[in-house]
C-alpha cells in the first residue's frame, strides 16, 4: 500500500473500472431522462416548464450526490481489500491525509460551484466544470499516489476544457471523462498489478 511511506499505491483497478461503468450508466440515464427524447415524456408528466425544471434540478442534484457516494465507496472499499490482499495495513496515516486533503479541496470547490450553477438554472458549463475540477484534484493528489493519476488528471482537464467550447454533447464528454477514461485506467491498473 505504501511505497517508501510517501505514496498510496493500493488503488484497485477493478474498483476504478467499476466506477467508469457506473458513470457511463449514469450518463445514459441522464440522457434518457433529460435528453431530447426523454423531455417528451417528462413534459407530459409535468406539463409546466417551471415544474419540469424543478424536477430536473432535484433529480440531478440527488443523482449526482448518490453517484459520488457510491463511486467513492467503491474505490475506498476495493482499495482497502487490495491492501489486505497484499498484506498491508490500510491506515489513515500522514500520506493518506495528504492524499485526501489534496484531492478534496479542488473537488469540493468544483462541486460547490456546480451546485450553485445548477440551483440557479445555469446548466451549460456544468459538465465542463466537473471534468476540470476533477482533473485538477487528480493532478493535485497524484504526488501521494500512483503517478498515472496525474495522467488521468491531465486527460480530464483537457476534456473539460474542450467541452467548454462545444455547446452540445455535454453528456458525451461527461461519459468519456468519467466513464471511458476510468475504465481504461482500471484496465491499466489490473494489468500492472498482475505483472508485479
Predicted feature residues:
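Membrane-water interface of alpha-helical transmembrane segments
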Residues: 6-13, 58, 97, 121-128, ...
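Selected alpha-helical membrane-embedding segments in polytopic membrane proteins
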Residues: 6-107
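Transmembrane helix-loop junctions in multipass membrane proteins, especially transporters and channels
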Residues: 31, 35-39, 80-88, 118-122, ...
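Terminal transmembrane helical module of multi-pass membrane proteins
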Residues: 134-196
Amino acid at each position: 500500500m505504501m511505497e517508501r511511506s510517501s505514496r498510496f499505491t493500493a488503488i484497485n483497478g477493478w474498483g476504478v473500472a467499476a466506477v467508469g461503468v457506473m458513470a457511463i450508466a449514469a450518463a445514459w440515464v441522464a440522457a434518457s431522462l433529460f435528453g431530447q427524447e426523454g423531455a417528451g415524456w417528462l413534459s407530459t408528466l409535468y406539463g409546466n416548464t417551471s415544474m419540469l425544471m424543478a424536477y430536473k434540478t432535484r433529480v440531478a442534484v440527488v443523482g449526482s450526490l448518490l453517484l459520488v457516494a457510491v463511486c467513492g465507496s467503491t474505490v475506498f472499499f476495493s482499495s482497502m481489500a487490495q491492501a489486505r490482499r497484499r498484506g498491508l495495513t490500510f491506515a489513515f496515516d500522514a500520506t493518506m491525509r495528504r492524499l485526501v486533503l489534496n484531492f478534496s479541496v479542488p473537488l469540493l470547490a468544483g462541486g460547490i460551484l456546480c451546485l450553485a450553477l445548477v440551483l440557479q438554472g445555469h446548466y451549460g458549463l456544468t459538465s465542463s466544470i466537473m471534468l476540470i475540477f476533477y482533473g485538477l484534484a487528480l493532478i493535485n493528489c497524484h504526488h501521494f499516489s500512483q503517478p498515472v493519476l496525474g495522467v488521468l488528471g491531465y486527460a480530464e482537464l483537457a476534456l473539460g476544457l474542450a467541452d467548454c467550447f462545444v455547446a452540445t454533447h455535454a453528456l458525451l464528454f461527461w461519459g468519456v471523462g468519467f466513464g471511458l477514461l476510468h475504465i481504461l485506467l482500471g484496465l491499466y491498473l489490473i494489468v500492472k498489478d498482475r505483472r508485479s
